Amino acid sequence: MKVRVSIKPICDKCKIIKRHGKIRVICENPKHKQVQG
């Protein structure tokens, strides 16, 4: 899980979702998980 100021999808399978007011990237690849913070 990476905490970044600006998040962007890394690959085609990355999806941007909003959960509890936080923007996240979820992906099949665990290395691509990101949260904005």
Curated annotation (Swiss-Prot):
Q: Which Pfam families match?
A: Ribosomal_L36
Q: Which GO terms describe its molecular function?
A: structural constituent of ribosome
Q: What is this protein called?
A: Large ribosomal subunit protein bL36
**GO term, biological process aspect, one:** translation
Organism superkingdom: Bacteria
Record's GO cellular component terms:
cytoplasm; ribonucleoprotein complex; ribosome
**Family per UniProt?**
Belongs to the bacterial ribosomal protein bL36 family.
HAMAP family, per this entry? Ribosomal_bL36
Question: Which ranges form a coiled coil?
Answer: none
The protein's UniProt keywords, in alphabetical order, are: Ribonucleoprotein, Ribosomal protein
**Gene it is expressed from:** rpmJ
**NCBIfam families from the xrefs?**
rpmJ_bact
